[in-house]
Amino acid sequence: MKHYQAYLIDLDGTMYKGTEEIDGAAQFIDYLNNNRIPHLYVTNNSTKTPVQVTEKLREMHIDAKPDEVVTSALATADYISEQHPNATVYMIGGHGLKTALTDAGLSIKNDEHVDYVVIGLDEKVTYEKLSIATLAVRNGAKFISTNPDVSIPKERGFLPGNGAITSVVSVSTGIQPEFIGKPETIIMSKSLDILGLEKSEVAMVGDLYDTDIMSGINVGIDTIHVQTGVSTYEDIQSKEIPPTYSFKDLNVAIAELEK
């Protein structure tokens, strides 16, 4: 296995599985920390702040810092503030998205006369929230969604994800949003900018082919698939573009790096 100068790392299915630890995850991060190898946690989760993400990782005995976390909410806020500083925004979403938008100097309004509509996962979404978003998009607001995941794994099973919520507005208006999170390149390009390295020096680590592995492929970096989450080894064998590597777990990756 190639020795990369830095890694972009998925969370659920790679670092942990729901509320369960994944063997090899904490050990892999310890290996990176001990060898001073930069890494960022890249997540489509828009509901949590980097501090909250870090708290979850530490519960899993993973030594992480908030400045190592790139959420789809952060990437969305940065993207809008670069395009249109001080823009007005109507948002559907959670605490993580609201915090990211306001920290970026954007003004959140509760009506349909805004510059942008931003949709992130909102477990308390209502018909009225979707109505305001729909009217704002029809009025000409730019339409952005933090990520396209149509379902998310929960203890009860797979529940509606942000892509499902977003689809209500896109179907109603006939306008497709710009997605920020994986597998799109915006969140990945932001992460690469933070690292400041060449693409050939960075690898994406994740379990889900359509999201994690494709995000690496789309942005032009190598990919490391771990068989600890959703996509199995058999699944990835049928793909037109396979990951650069596929390992049973991150313990195997450590063993490869220590050769």
Swiss-Prot record:
Keywords: Hydrolase, Magnesium, Metal-binding. Belongs to the HAD-like hydrolase superfamily. NagD family. One of its GO terms (molecular function) is phosphatase activity. The keyword Metal-binding applies. This is Acid sugar phosphatase. Catalyzes the dephosphorylation of 2-6 carbon acid sugars in vitro. Its EC number is 3.1.3.-. Pfam families: Hydrolase_6 (PF13344), Hydrolase_like (PF13242). One of its GO terms (cellular component) is cytoplasm. Its cofactor is Mg(2+). Transmembrane segments: none annotated.
